[in-house]
């Protein structure tokens, strides 16, 4: 039960031949090859350099930190 016998492999082979047949399998491999070629062609077209991003002159943001102001309590101490 742990390994497959020759009969198991024969049944699997017959099922594969029935499902895919002689012409279907070669057609599928041709379609896969066309897809790979198309993918490679698309990847080679994307190698065009992209323009550098624009440099924006940044201005320093105003300092919004809280500064303590004197109050009546702190003046009396």
UniProtKB/Swiss-Prot annotation:
Partners and quaternary state?
The Tat system comprises two distinct complexes: a TatABC complex, containing multiple copies of TatA, TatB and TatC subunits, and a separate TatA complex, containing only TatA subunits. Substrates initially bind to the TatABC complex, which probably triggers association of the separate TatA complex to form the active translocon.
Would you tell me the protein name for this molecule? Sec-independent protein translocase protein TatA
Q: Where in the cell is it found?
A: Cell inner membrane
Region described as Disordered: spans on this chain: 41-77
**Entries under Pfam families matching the protein:** TatA_B_E
- Segments spanning the bilayer are 1-21
The coiled-coil regions, if any, are none
Mind listing the GO molecular function terms for this protein?
protein transmembrane transporter activity
Q: What is the lineage of its organism?
A: Bacteria, Pseudomonadati, Pseudomonadota, Alphaproteobacteria, Sphingomonadales
Q: What does this protein do?
A: Part of the twin-arginine translocation (Tat) system that transports large folded proteins containing a characteristic twin-arginine motif in their signal peptide across membranes. TatA could form the protein-conducting channel of the Tat system.
Q: Where is it chiefly localized?
A: membrane
Q: What GO CC annotations are associated with the protein?
A: TAT protein transport complex
Which keywords appear in this protein's UniProt record, sorted alphabetically?
A: Cell inner membrane, Cell membrane, Membrane, Protein transport, Translocation, Transmembrane, Transmembrane helix, Transport
Task: Give residue spans, biased composition: Polar residues.
Answer: 66-77
Task: List the cysteine pairs that form cystine.
Answer: none
State the Gene Ontology BP annotations: protein transport by the Tat complex
What family name appears in the similarity comment?
Belongs to the TatA/E family.
């Amino acid at each position: 039960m742990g390994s497959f016998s020759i009969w198991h492999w024969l049944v699997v082979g017959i099922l594969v031949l029935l499902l895919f047949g002689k012409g279907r399998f070669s057609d599928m491999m041709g379609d896969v090859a066309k897809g790979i070629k198309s993918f490679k062609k698309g990847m080679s077209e994307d190698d065009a350099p992209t323009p550098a991003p624009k440099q924006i002159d940044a201005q320093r943001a105003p300092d919004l930190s809280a500064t303590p102001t004197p109050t009546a309590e702190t003046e009396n101490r």
